């Protein structure tokens, strides 16, 4: 009986500490933009996995596999010789004007995330034009508890949101906003 009481007391003392031992949680964001151009025109500009020249942060894109599943690309950011992001395509649909990809390699100093996947979609907008949706899911750049500020959840969310917003703002600048 004493042994059973001891085990129950030990379990009661241990369980609360296990609740504090969790790691990071998967973050999810969605950023959208409305543009005046019809979906086919917007898709023609952004639908090629091997060409991210429409994004102002991307200096160049090189890759293999066109728009086939498992195609790869490397984005060079900023300028020649700038930091890189390696990505792989895992879903592509011309009919749905959508593709999905994940990062296979990036330094957390460049983008403070791990296990990142993303989806880019163009849809018709009620009233004409297009709705471009860019959504992603990822973990912060630091996998353990108590991350440094530059690798915490807030830093990861801010960085990915900034990437998406810059790209979508460039599309609005290129194609115009509805009603403008």
Protein language model regions, located:
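Hydrophobic ligand-binding cavity/cleft-lining segments
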Residues: 18-68
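Glycine-rich portal/gate segments that line the openings of hydrophobic small-molecule binding cavities
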Residues: 34, 51-57, 61-111, 169-179
């Amino acid at each position: 009986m004493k042994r059973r009481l001891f085990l129950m007391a030990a379990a009661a003392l241990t369980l609360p500490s296990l609740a504090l031992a969790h790691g990071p949680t998967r973050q999810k964001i969605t950023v959208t933009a409305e543009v005046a151009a019809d979906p086919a025109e917007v898709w023609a500009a952004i639908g090629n996995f091997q060409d991210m020249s429409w994004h102002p942060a991307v200096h160049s894109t090189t890759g293999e596999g066109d728009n086939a599943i498992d195609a790869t690309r490397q984005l060079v950011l900023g300028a020649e010789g700038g930091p890189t992001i390696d990505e792989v395509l895992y879903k592509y649909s011309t009919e749905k004007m959508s593709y999905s990809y994940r990062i296979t390699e990036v330094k957390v100093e460049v983008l403070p995330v791990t296990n990142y996947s993303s989806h880019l979609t163009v849809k018709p907008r009620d009233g004409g034009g297009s709705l471009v949706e860019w959504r992603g899911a990822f973990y912060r750049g630091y996998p353990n508890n108590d991350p440094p500020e530059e690798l915490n959840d807030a830093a990861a969310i801010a960085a990915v949101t900034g990437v998406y917003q810059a790209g979508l703002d460039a599309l609005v600048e290129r194609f115009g906003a509805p009603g403008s």
